[in-house]
Amino acid sequence: MKGKIFSILMAVVLIGALIAIGCAPKPAPAPAPAPAPAPAPAPAPKPAPAPAPAPAPAPAPAPAPAPAPAPAPAPAPAPAQPAKVYKVKLSTHVPAASAYTVFWTDFVKQLNTAGGGALDITLFAGGAVAPATKEFDGVDQGILEMGTTCTMYWLDKWLASGLFTYTVGGLSPSEAMMWGMNEGIPLLNEMMKATNVEIIGGIITVPEAFMSSKKAINTKADIRGLKIRAAGDGGIMFSKMGASVVMLPGGEIYEALQRGVIDACEISSPGFDWTLATYEVIKYMYLSPVRQPCEWLPVMVNKKWWATVPDSLKMLLIEMTKGGAWNYLNKMSKADVVAIPAYKAKGVQVLPIPKDVENEMATIAAAYYSEQAAKDAFFK
């Protein structure tokens, strides 16, 4: 019995000891040594290139579209219409060899060139189309599209017409040109408004010689009975001074002097007269600007033809005529400087007109103009 109790006690002690050991705190573990630094990581190896992707399979070809119907052929363009060319017959009033027609020969070439092919002007000398000095009638009737002449040849139509080319004792060339551009042309067109002629400009030149003669002129008495070719207001004054005045076209003067039909003439300036060879048939050339201090020569157009001309060509003709006027004045100024000594070299006496002749003409002219102005409002 005692043995069983003892065995039970020993079992209880053993179980208690085991429980105590299980419940006692565990000793703290020794600190772990610091870990060694980690070695630097080796560089990562470059990745192997990715294998090239397999080529995509070629797409199946799209079915070809049905061909579009061929377009109808475009109609052939109409042939270009040729630019209109304005053909012009233009006449001067003097012979082909005269300085004025020679000037126009060159001037027409310039106009045709400036027109760029739209102008085709053909020049004619005085008498070739219309009778010489009747160029106005030729333009009025449409025989000529253009013409140039002297207004004094129209005295049979208008008493005031002579005032536009020149007046005895009147304006100098530059003054006459300025007056023509500003007042003269409008007045001239007003005077002839009932006709088929329009003035678009004018050419100006130097003073004329007073007279060329086969006979000496020493006093105003020598004018009386003299057979002289003259035109315009100068002719009227010579008549009032007692001369026997005839009107001849420029191309007939040489022969009339040569044959004795006339004793003297007034044509134009020494440079112009030289081109008509008057040095062969005169003995004296008398100089003075009083009889004709300038010469303004209108440039005329046929109104019906002018109405068909485009504004661009109208402007070209008008503006180039202004330039041509000054060019001709310059040309003839130089020609006079050459001609006067040339006349002397041919044996012609080149002299100033005697003062009493010059004064007599100026006095008669002043009275004449006053008388006509009192009669005719337009003349005034």
Predicted regions and their residues:
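Short, low-complexity disordered leader/linker segments with a strong preference
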Residues: 1-87
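N-terminal secretory/targeting leader peptides
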Residues: 24-26, 46, 79-176, 187-380
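An acidic, glycine-rich surface segment that forms the CoA-thioester-binding/catalytic face
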Residues: 182
